[in-house]
């Protein structure tokens, strides 16, 4: 039975993506080019490749990042935290210290923020794998 004719889950999906070396274009085409998180781009051009891992959803709302700071300690190795924002307008949700903790201490593969970040120059200079809206 081929991979494409049966349901696959979790670690098996990640293994297949790595083994077959799928590109971001192929993944986007498979997702119908929906732009899963529109306007979210890598801040480091060397991070245009696909990052693999389980995701951990986090939330920031009403211009507060309190819940994000509580959840930072729950991130596991190889996870990709995705931080969604609601009513945060032009406020940066996290910066270099929190990103470094998630990536270097907890072992996150990347960090995705559906919102703004601070310390952009440091994030770029340290080549941290961050996708954000600005």
Set out the residue ranges of the language-model regions:
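Feature captures the catalytic cores and cofactor-binding loops of soluble hydro-lyases/lyases
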Residues: 2-134
